[in-house]
């Protein structure tokens, strides 16, 4: 009987030992997995740090220096040289400096009457502030008007209106541009609708800018009625 008990005890101990051995093996395997995960994370972190300190920061510094030089050139009145400098920054760099360079290049190109190229640089510009972003989109619309691409112009003015976020100074200004294009397209009913919206939402705009909004509206309504 004692021998049976001894055998049972040994069997139980063996089972425990086997369980412990299996558990130890699982722990070792888990430790290896964790080690490889940590190593992989370390490699990724190192790559990110290298990108930030060896590539991104020097790139940002170079872009800032280049656009700063273009700003100095522009301040001396040498627009053509400044334009080339802005174009180089916009074409070769990202970051905020490249973004601003794209906008400045577009403005100078527009002044030179190079509307198609100006519109392309405005496509590169990523607005970070509502008023400037809306003005940039409006300028792109002006480019398309000069290229007789009225549909594209309307799209730009609609975006400018949305981006300007009901700014009482700028939103109705962009709406007036939209109405002008609609008039050019002889879409008088849509033109009238824009004037009504300005009068309703920005009642002081006309008086503040010397624009007789009611007369503009009446004219559009009469022409819309005549065209039916």
Where are these regions (language model features)?
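Short solvent-exposed coil/turn linkers within tandem alpha-helical repeat scaffolds
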Residues: 57, 89-98, 124-134, 161-171, ...
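TPR-repeat structural position
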Residues: 79-80, 115, 150, 188
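N-terminal positive-inside, membrane-proximal cytosolic segments immediately preceding the first
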Residues: 2-40
């Amino acid at each position: 009987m004692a021998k049976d008990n001894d055998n049972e005890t040994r069997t139980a101990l063996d089972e425990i030992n086997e369980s412990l051995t299996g558990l130890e093996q699982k722990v070792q395997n888990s430790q290896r997995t964790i080690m490889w995960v940590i190593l992989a994370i370390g490699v990724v972190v190192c790559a990110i740090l290298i990108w930030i300190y060896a590539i991104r920061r020097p790139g940002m510094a170079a872009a800032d220096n280049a656009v700063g030089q273009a700003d100095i050139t522009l301040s001396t009145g040498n627009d053509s040289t400044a334009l080339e400098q802005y174009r180089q920054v916009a074409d070769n760099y990202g970051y905020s400096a490249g973004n601003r360079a794209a906008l400045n290049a577009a403005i100078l190109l527009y002044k030179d009457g190079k509307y198609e190229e100006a519109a392309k640089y405005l496509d590169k510009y990523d607005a970070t502030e509502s008023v400037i972003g809306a003005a940039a989109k409006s300028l792109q619309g002006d480019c398309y008007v000069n290229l007789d691409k009225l549909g594209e112009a309307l799209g730009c003015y609609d975006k400018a209106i949305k981006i300007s976020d009901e700014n009482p100074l700028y939103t109705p200004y962009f709406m007036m541009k939209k109405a002008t294009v609609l008039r050019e397209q002889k879409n008088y009913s849509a033109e009238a609708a824009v004037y009504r919206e300005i009068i309703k939402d920005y009642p002081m705009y006309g008086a503040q800018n010397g624009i007789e909004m009611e007369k503009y509206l009446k004219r559009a309504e009469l022409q819309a009625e005549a065209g039916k």
